[in-house]
Design a protein with these regions (language model features):
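A nucleotide-sugar donor-handling region in carbohydrate enzymes
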Residues: 2-4, 121-127, 139-200
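A structural signal for isolated positions on well-ordered beta-strands in alpha/beta enzyme cores
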Residues: 21, 51-53, 115, 149, ...
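A short acidic (Asp/Glu
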Residues: 31-35, 63-68, 107-109, 126-127, ...
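Helix N-cap/beta->alpha junction signal
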Residues: 56-58, 100, 153-156
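N-terminal pre-catalytic "stem/leader" segment of glycosyltransferase-like enzymes
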Residues: 1-85
Length: 200
């Protein structure tokens, strides 16, 4: 049913050039890379005309809102995953950003731009390296193939993702070696001050 509802909006809705959808861990989280990208979108005047939607699971909506408010960030739209509003956002946003994968029924429309930041450095087995889980890599591969940009913090991560998900002959997109957005925390004076106060 979810797939049918989503496809309906994919076919019907035009792309909104000023809408950005952000999702972390299929809506299970709302921090990490997604938080730092959202923060930039909210605080940088160059993006004042854009609407940023963070998609989270129903039980996470209140804690996500409280988290962003505690950081002094307002203007974010929180959307519950697997709802009408979610399907509409996914089907109409010009820009799609995920640190994992979108749900299996996701289809990228022509004209949409997808940035995948992944969410960590692969120090554990992934993809085909997980012997008893190879049947589950299809959705991850699909998301990587759909991505216009794949962001990695280092060549180790990039090479492992390409190898473990067998992307070499599948992906013809752009690999960005620019570090993870969440690593800006190491250079943020406010964050440094908060940590010192908390642990002093």
């Amino acid at each position: 049913i979810a797939k049918c509802n989503y496809i309906k909006y994919v076919k019907k809705l035009p792309i909104d050039d000023h809408r950005i959808v952000l999702e972390s861990q299929q809506g299970k989280e709302f921090g990490g890379n997604i938080y730092y990208i959202a923060k930039e979108l909210l605080l940088n005047k160059d993006y004042a005309s854009f609407q940023a939607d963070i998609c989270v699971q129903k039980e996470k909506i209140d804690s996500a809102r409280a988290f962003y408010e505690a950081k002094g960030l307002s203007g974010i739209h929180f959307i519950e995953t697997n709802t009408k509003k979610y399907y509409q956002a996914m089907a109409s946003a010009k820009y799609l950003i995920s640190d994992n994968t979108f749900l299996p029924y996701f289809i990228k429309k022509e004209g949409q731009i997808y940035l995948n930041t992944w969410h960590g450095t692969p120090l554990k087995s992934l993809g085909k390296s997980i012997q008893n889980d190879m049947h589950n890599i299809g959705n991850t591969q699909k998301n990587f193939v759909y991505s216009d940009y794949l962001l990695y913090p280092n060549s180790y991560t990039r090479d492992h993702m390409i190898e473990d998900y067998m992307l070499e002959d599948l992906c013809h997109n752009t690999y960005l070696m620019d570090g993870y957005p969440r690593n800006t925390a190491f250079f943020d004076e406010e964050t440094k001050k908060e940590i010192i106060e908390k642990y002093s």
